[in-house]
Regions:
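An N-terminal assembly and electron-transfer interface module characteristic of large anaerobic redox
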Residues: 1-211
Length: 211
């Protein structure tokens, strides 16, 4: 069973205060700790495409195999989508809700609108990420979303390293004939389908094998 090591990367649109994303990211990490969910807090905040490589390198160096992309404010559309692409593993995206209406200069996140743009950008790029049913929340709410993401990430990691060896009507290495199992290939599963003749041949080759 794959062991999931989560990392969280905050993103910030450069017309917002970067410290807002940092503060909200820390709050999410603290809430996760209270819930018993361990995750690595990436110190790089992604504002531009130049930050993406740095953030991915940081979480990879920490051994993370699953990622939470956290919109601490509106978020930069292209860099956050590239973050999902370049990381290459299971990724969840969630966004911060505004804590109060009393600080609309330095405390305005506008993350709900950013979440809409992010999901559309992912669709245009044909990238896959887990988006919770209600992806905008407080630190405690997002900690709950992250806890729910862990078993999903575990399943994705397990399937991505799965190899299925089957015996059916199609001979080995006839990928063009395997349209019915195409959805499995799309999930990253490696499939080797052998024909009944392949099975018969293998059986004969191992005749009298003491194993």
């Amino acid at each position: 069973i794959p062991q999931v090591k989560l990392g969280i990367v905050a993103v910030s649109r450069d017309c917002f205060v970067l410290s807002l994303s940092e503060r909200r990211r820390r709050a999410v990490v603290e809430s996760c700790a209270k819930e018993g969910t361990s995750l690595y807090e990436c110190k790089t905040v992604v504002e531009s495409e130049n930050d993406v490589a740095k953030a991915v390198a940081e979480v990879k160096a920490a051994g993370c195999n699953a990622l939470v992309v956290f919109l601490g404010n509106f978020g930069p559309e292209t860099p956050e989508a590239l973050l999902v692409k370049e990381f290459g593993g299971p990724a969840m995206i969630a966004a911060a809700a505004e804590e109060t209406g009393k600080d609309l200069i330095n405390g305005r996140g506008d993350a709900y609108c950013g979440m809409l743009n992010c999901s559309y950008n992912l669709g245009l790029r044909k990238l896959k990420a887990v988006i919770p049913a209600y992806p905008v929340g407080t630190a405690d709410g997002i900690a709950g979303m992250i806890a729910d993401f862990v078993p999903v990430a575990r399943a994705i990691l397990g399937l991505s390293s799965l190899k299925i060896i089957t015996f059916g009507p199609r001979p080995y290495d006839f990928l063009a004939c395997n349209a019915p199992i195409a959805p499995l290939f799309k999930m990253g599963i490696n499939i080797q389908e052998n024909s009944e003749l392949d099975l018969f041949e293998a059986y004969n080759k191992h005749k009298d094998d003491p194993r």
